[in-house]
Amino acid sequence: MQDNKDVFRRIERQYYRDRMGTLGLSTVEGMLLRWLGKQGQTRQEELVVQLVLDKGAVARALARLEELGLVERAVSDRCRREKLVSPTPEGLVLAGAIQQSVEEWNTVCFQGFSPQERALFTDLFTRITQNAMEYKQGEKEHG
C-alpha cells in the first residue's frame, strides 16, 4: 500500500522538475531564484539555512545562475568570507514565472477545498514544517 505523502511528493517533484525544465533550470536553481525574487539580496549561507539545502548544491546552483545572468554574487563589506546574492532584472522576470508555477500547483492541490480548510491545512503544515526544521537543527547541533 502506498503512503499518500509519498505519492504526493513524487507527483509534486515531477511537476516542479517539468516546470523548471521548461525554464531551463533545475529544481534547486528554481527554488533559489524564487527565494531571491521574493526576498531580494540574501547571504549565500542564509539560502542554505532557509531552504534546507546542501552548501555545495547551493554553491553549484548559484554558479550556474550567475553564468546565465540571473543572479549576481558579491563579497560582503562586513565579512570577506560572506557572499551576498542578488537577482538580476532577468532573474526577477524568471522568478515571477516560477512563482506563477507555484500558484498553479497550489490551485491544483487545493481544488475543492473551502477557504477554512485551506487555512487549516496551511496552519497545520506550517507547524509540521517547524517541527521538522527543529529536528534538523537539533541533528546538526548534536551530531
Region locations from a protein language model:
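Short capping segments at the starts of secondary-structure elements
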Residues: 39-43
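Short, locally clustered residues in the helix-turn-helix/winged-helix DNA-binding domain
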Residues: 9, 34-38, 99, 126
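N-terminal leader segment of winged-helix/HTH proteins
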Residues: 1-23, 139
